[in-house]
Amino acid sequence: MEGIFAAYVLPALIIALKSVVLLVVLLIVVAYLLYADRKIWAAVQLRRGPNVVGPWGLFQAFADLLKFVFKEPIIPSGANKGVFLLAPFISAVLAMATWAVIPVNESWAVANINVGILYIFAISSLEVYGVIMGGWASNSKYPFLGALRSAAQMVSYEVSIGFVIVTVLLTVGSLNLTDIVLSQNTGLGTMLGLPASFLDWNWLCLFPMFVVFFISALAETNRPPFDLVEAESELVAGHMIEYSSTPFLLFFLGEYVAITLMCALMTVLFLGGWLPPVDVWFLSWVPGIIWFMLKLCFCFFLFAMVKAFVPRYRYDQLMRLGWKVFLPISLFMVVATATFLKVFGLA
């Protein structure tokens, strides 16, 4: 009996505990990133932003949570009730499930699997189904148009993101996210005789792919200037028009968790994960999770600034950018990287 407990029950309990801790921390982080997003946007527009609930408005996100939870969920009379309620649940759960393999520090992941990046790409590809189901089940034109746009947009930019990831995998030689971070201890900087630093991270040697990944991540998560799925001036709120109360909250949560995931992926693939910017003793003393969170917040700040400054693209411009600009660039970089590694015997 003790052998069964040690072999099966205890590992399952540990994974369940890790998952609960990850979920709680993730929801708190998302709440304050949403607060930061609103504050940054307000500052750009010379407004104060959230400033009533708690000191400096720090508890505004939790007040919004209570507001949504206690509202009555309204289901349109012509909607497919089962699919209508299932769609936001799928969107939120899939977005949170991808975080299981993200290492916020060395050996700090719910599941440190050897195909971590493949797992993320597979799960995130399924998130579009939540949007499509919600748009179709609402039995309304605007949500359906938003869902159709979402399907085309996400599929288009997943291609570019996939080739960016292939380029990183060629340079690292592993699908394990921890290995990808540790490989950035050495790079261009150390080849020039400098100590390990931010010059070794992949953002420098793969800078074109870093830019492609950043812009594609904006499109993949429906962030401005690529928020055609829920364009307020055209579709009011896109696939979420008919949603209210907790179902709307789940869609909104899934969207911001996906944004946070893209920021974390950018940190892991290009910004050295939990590695300090310079390998000196007083920076190495800082816990790796602190560096990871600082880099994640920096990436989110870039997302917020793009939202504040860049006007929305037309739909044809969005598609042209994905298929006629990013796809050729990413394909060329895959071929160029593979050729470079083969010619110089680094493969």
Curated annotation (Swiss-Prot):
It comes from the Bacteria. It is a multi-pass membrane protein. The keyword NAD applies. The chain crosses the membrane at residues 13-33, 50-70, 82-102, 115-135, 161-181, 198-218, 248-268, 286-306, 325-345. PROSITE patterns: COMPLEX1_ND1_2. One of its GO terms (biological process) is aerobic respiration. GO terms for molecular function: NADH dehydrogenase activity; oxidoreductase activity, acting on NAD(P)H, quinone or similar compound as acceptor; quinone binding. GO terms for cellular component: plasma membrane. Keywords: Cell inner membrane, Cell membrane, Membrane, NAD, Quinone, Translocase, Transmembrane, Transmembrane helix, Ubiquinone. InterPro entries: NADH_UbQ_OxRdtase_su1/FPO, NADH_UbQ_OxRdtase_su1_CS. This is NADH-quinone oxidoreductase subunit H. NDH-1 shuttles electrons from NADH, via FMN and iron-sulfur (Fe-S) centers, to quinones in the respiratory chain. The immediate electron acceptor for the enzyme in this species is believed to be ubiquinone. Couples the redox reaction to proton translocation (for every two electrons transferred, four hydrogen ions are translocated across the cytoplasmic membrane), and thus conserves the redox energy in a proton gradient. This subunit may bind ubiquinone. Its main location: membrane. It catalyses: a quinone + NADH + 5 H(+)(in) = a quinol + NAD(+) + 4 H(+)(out). PANTHER family: NADH DEHYDROGENASE SUBUNIT 1, NADH-UBIQUINONE OXIDOREDUCTASE CHAIN 1. Belongs to the complex I subunit 1 family. It is found in: Cell inner membrane. Its EC number is 7.1.1.-.
